[in-house]
Amino acid sequence: VIYSHHHWDHASGGAVFADTADFVGHANMLSHLEMPPNSTTLSDVIGQYAPVAALDANDNDRIERGEANGNISDSQFRAFDANGDDGLNGAEVARGPVSLVHPPNVTYENELEITLGGKRVRLEWLEEMNHSFDMSRITFPEESTMMVVDYITFGRLPFREMDYENGMFQEWMAAIRETEEAAKDFEYVTTGHGPLGNWENITEWRVYFELLHEAVAAGIAAGQSLEEMQSNVEIPEYEHWGGYSWLNENVLGMYHFLTD
């Protein structure tokens, strides 16, 4: 089992293969799966999982299943609930819904090549960047195929607030540009979300970020508030992409990248 990174929607459920399989991922995946300190409160949670933390309607620093119903799925609730007590504390929410992720028993630091079915599979670490610190780019040389997950997506805007709490936008862009060049050696590029493509689709993804950066930076320079920018910023070249309704959240993320 080869992991791109630790996020629940790409890494959950591997335990069914635990009797026979090795689990391969970057060494940083292990730290991502660690539980934050018990002292972590729901009010400490920012960014991607802040909406989950906000479900604490009775303000007891614990999210009961009844508070979560209708807001997150049952399977996602169970993925947050590391201790299985049918409630979510601050540490569980801050860590994310990764309780169903089987940890890797084979890890690497910079790059790794393995053989599956007589064919090479290469994993390359993309260094610490915004989406996660354990991201692997996976390539299949014989198939001329590169796989990139989450930090690049085709035909869809970046997910919601873009994990701005990690504060590593420039590192994210560096990984995108480096991948854009590397992808020119491959016929196919496949992503964790979206259609099959090639290096030109990575260019489209990069240009979106550049346009978003330019628009938000201009709004800041003009003295606009975040709310004004969320109302005013439009990127019509990408209106046909999926997730365009997330643009106001993308603006929020870029605003934090530029001001925090």
Q: Predicted regions: what is each one?
A:
Residues 6-11, 29-32, 94-95, 114, ...:
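Solvent-exposed loop/turn segments at secondary-structure junctions
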Residues 1-55, 62-113, 133:
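Active-site HxH/HxHxD metal-binding segment of metal-dependent hydrolases
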Residues 16-19, 174, 211-214:
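Alpha-helical scaffolding segments of alpha/beta enzyme cores, especially the outer helices
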Residues 93-96, 117-123:
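Short Pro/Gly-enriched beta-strand edge/turn motifs at strand-loop
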Residues 113, 120, 124-211:
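Metallo-beta-lactamase
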Residues 58-80, 84-96, 130, 180-186, ...:
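Accessory terminal helices/loops
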Residues 5, 17, 23, 108, ...:
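Divalent metal-coordination and catalytic microenvironments
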Residues 21, 28, 118, 141-144:
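Short loop segments at secondary-structure junctions
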